């Protein structure tokens, strides 16, 4: 049986939307899907398709993974905010609302990739049993 592995070489540029009409177009769902798909080995979709034969069931599984990655991403972002505030960070006002001051700002897409890789590890473990 072919094993699923986790790809730890995904970069922020890999998950950016390719065809966006405007910068205000929300692309988080696309980034979430790209992040976890790219975090799995090339054979992962074939292994999943062989295990979950029904297309509707497989699509429901993919949506569940999307939710799991999204929830993990939010968890990591909240953890970063809490740790930053505990370390003395302050919120500043910008034209878009409140955010952490520059010294504590991080790249949200990097945290998304970490979240996707954490979920990918679970997927690999589940399918490699």
Swiss-Prot record:
GO biological process, alphabetically ordered: DNA replication
InterPro entries: Phage_T4_P15K_Rpol-bd
Keyword Zinc among record annotations: no
Signal peptide start-end: none
UniProt superkingdom: Viruses
Keywords: DNA replication
Job of this protein: Binds to host RNA polymerase core.
Protein name: 15 kDa RNA polymerase-binding protein
């Amino acid at each position: 049986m072919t094993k699923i592995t986790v790809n730890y070489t995904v970069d922020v540029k890999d998950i950016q939307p390719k065809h966006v009409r405007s910068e205000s177009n929300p692309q988080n769902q696309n980034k979430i899907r790209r992040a976890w798909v790219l975090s799995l080995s090339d054979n992962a979709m074939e292994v999943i398709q062989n295990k979950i034969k029904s297309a509707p069931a497989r699509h429901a599984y993919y949506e569940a993974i999307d939710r799991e990655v999204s929830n993990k991403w939010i968890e990591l972002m909240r953890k970063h905010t809490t740790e930053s505030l505990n370390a003395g960070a302050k919120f500043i006002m910008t034209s878009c609302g409140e955010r952490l001051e520059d010294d504590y700002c991080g790249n949200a897409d990097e945290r998304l990739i970490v979240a996707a890789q954490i979920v990918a590890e679970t997927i690999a473990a589940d399918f490699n049993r």
